[in-house]
Amino acid sequence: MESLNVNAKNWKALIKPAQLDVKISDDKSHAKIIAEPLEKGYGLTLGNSLRRILLSSIRGAAVTSIQIDGVLHEFTSIKGVREDVTDIVLNVKSLALKSSSETTKKLILDAKGPGEIKASDIAPVADIEILNPDLVICNLDENTHFHMEMNVGTGKGYVPAVMNKPEEPPLGLIAIDSLYSPVKKVSYSISTAREGKALDYDKLIMEVETNGSISAEDAVAYSARIFQDQLNMFVNFDEPVEVPVKEVSSEPEFNKNLLRKVDELELSVRSMNCLKNDNIIYIGDLVQKSEGEMLRTPNFGRKSLNEIKEVLTGMSLYLGMEIPNWPPENIAEMSKKLEEQI
């Protein structure tokens, strides 16, 4: 493989957001996330990828099958129950559940009429939380007894009823479709972002809504982690790469500008003060800082960042470089020698 120090510019020189702007609802089920600036086209790349992962790969809990006393299949009606079994199945599918168990759990609903039977009437079970207790399951007439058992599993995405049906189902077991995903809605839009005087950058705006079993912000974080994990297999090198050291080397094997002090750069007073306050003495110290690290420096803004990037570009340098064996043991002597030569 070619030198990593040369090719690292492929990813280290790309602009990245210093941080995300996240706005979360009080119940944490809705989040608006803004990432800017991004390289042109990266808004679509990231937004579409994260949306697909959010909707397909975040794990959750759902009912997989039910059994109702006196019912053999779903295409029937129950005496004293206003809804037929098909309607009850649809209502059960709408249950929003949170499970802290990886094993199948059983929920029991045992009720007597008359009246409206809700999810809150389901008997409490350890490790299972019902997030929409006001959901109506069915309506019972007077003197009607209704008993239903529901099996709850965990998984991801959508699983059809046929996949939830065991090979030898007990009499009266009705397998139902399971939508495990806790993510209800994901949308994104892309607009133009400004970076200095340039307007050819992307701003990614994502809105995520969940059923409450997971916060919208965490759902985005987990989807990004899934994406990262899948991409790792394509990276065929390790960081950092050791650079072979020559047996005899009287001169440094890096850009001599790295030995110059930052106060030799023609920077504004504000930028120079920020560098001094961060104890950045040599240009070699400066270029090893990432854009994010620089922007976290007190009083250091985008204007100062762009100013420094422009100066470094003129020296064929950039922020985020990796410089093996920096700083040299005799850096003060080497810097002085270079200054005399200049």
From Swiss-Prot:
Catalytic reactions on record: RNA(n) + a ribonucleoside 5'-triphosphate = RNA(n+1) + diphosphate
Gene Ontology molecular function terms on file: DNA binding; DNA-directed RNA polymerase activity; protein dimerization activity
Region: Alpha C-terminal domain (alpha-CTD), residue numbers: 254-342
GO biological process, one term: DNA-templated transcription
A Pfam match: RNA_pol_A_CTD
SUPFAM superfamilies for the chain: C-terminal domain of RNA polymerase alpha subunit, Insert subdomain of RNA polymerase alpha subunit, RBP11-like subunits of RNA polymerase
Transcription as UniProt keyword: yes
Gene3D superfamilies in the record: 5' to 3' exonuclease, C-terminal subdomain, DNA-directed RNA polymerase, insert domain, RNA polymerase, RBP11-like subunit
Highest taxon, organism lineage: Bacteria
The protein's enzyme class: transferase
Keywords: DNA-directed RNA polymerase, Nucleotidyltransferase, Transcription, Transferase
Residue ranges of the region described as Alpha N-terminal domain (alpha-NTD): 1-238
Transmembrane domains' residue ranges: none
GO cellular component: cytoplasm; DNA-directed RNA polymerase complex
Complex and partners: Homodimer. The RNAP catalytic core consists of 2 alpha, 1 beta, 1 beta' and 1 omega subunit. When a sigma factor is associated with the core the holoenzyme is formed, which can initiate transcription.
Family: Belongs to the RNA polymerase alpha chain family.
Described function: DNA-dependent RNA polymerase catalyzes the transcription of DNA into RNA using the four ribonucleoside triphosphates as substrates.
Domain notes: The N-terminal domain is essential for RNAP assembly and basal transcription, whereas the C-terminal domain is involved in interaction with transcriptional regulators and with upstream promoter elements.
Protein name: DNA-directed RNA polymerase subunit alpha
Originating organism: Pelagibacter ubique (strain HTCC1062)
Gene name per UniProt: rpoA
